[in-house]
């Protein structure tokens, strides 16, 4: 039996967008549309779609490599019961996803974006990213805030509480500037933020002196 492009597209949508397992998808298509499609055929539909979109995915990778700013992350999940990692590299307009059994450099090298990326990469301080020397690094402030709050709650570090307020205040200033149609903060505000930030870092070092 032959199936048309609409059936195949709907099947791929159910699997990739709604995350419906093959057996449930098979049952859904049979119950709603009286289509007796095997799970093997459903997998074939997906593999064909993956092959068809390769030119588009390669174009996305190439565009991200040339971007001035990129974002990278890795999220653990399971493939057929085995631990794997979903790697993402994105810009404000494009996102590339690829699963890999490794979380580290073996995966990011195989994916091929970061070895050629020369812009600024925003990430979560995962050690793998620092192994790439052609790019600039920017660390995620959400992760900074989590670590700072942990220092406040677990170790009663006063400097960490001040840094939380500093980062959140800077974020609020950026949001207000954005709402006002500005693309950057005034130089005076930036200078003040830097001064407060540096003072808090100095306070933190005073609270936690380096060993002799």
Predicted regions mapped to residue ranges:
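Catalytic center-proximal scaffold of phosphoryl-transfer enzymes
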Residues: 1-212
């Amino acid at each position: 039996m032959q199936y048309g492009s609409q059936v195949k597209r709907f099947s791929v949508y159910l699997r990739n967008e709604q995350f419906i397992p093959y057996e449930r998808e098979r049952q859904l298509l049979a119950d709603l549309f009286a289509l007796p499609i095997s799970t093997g055929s459903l997998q074939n539909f997906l593999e064909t779609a993956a092959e068809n979109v390769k030119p588009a995915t390669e174009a996305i990778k190439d565009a991200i490599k040339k971007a001035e700013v990129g974002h990278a992350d890795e999220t653990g999940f399971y493939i057929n019961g085995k631990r794997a990692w979903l790697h993402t590299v994105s810009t404000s307009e494009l996102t590339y996803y690829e699963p890999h059994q490794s979380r580290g450099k073996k995966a990011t090298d195989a994916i091929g974006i970061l070895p050629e990326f020369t812009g600024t990469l925003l990430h979560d301080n995962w050690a793998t990213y620092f192994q790439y020397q052609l790019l600039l690094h920017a660390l995620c402030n959400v992760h900074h805030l989590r670590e700072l709050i942990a220092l406040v709650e677990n170790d009663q570090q006063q400097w960490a509480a001040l840094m939380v307020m500093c980062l959140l205040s800077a974020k609020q200033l950026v949001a207000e500037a954005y709402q006002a149609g500005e693309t950057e903060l005034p130089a005076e505000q930036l200078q003040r933020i830097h001064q407060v930030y540096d003072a808090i870092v100095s306070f933190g070092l005073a609270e936690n002196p380096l060993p002799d």
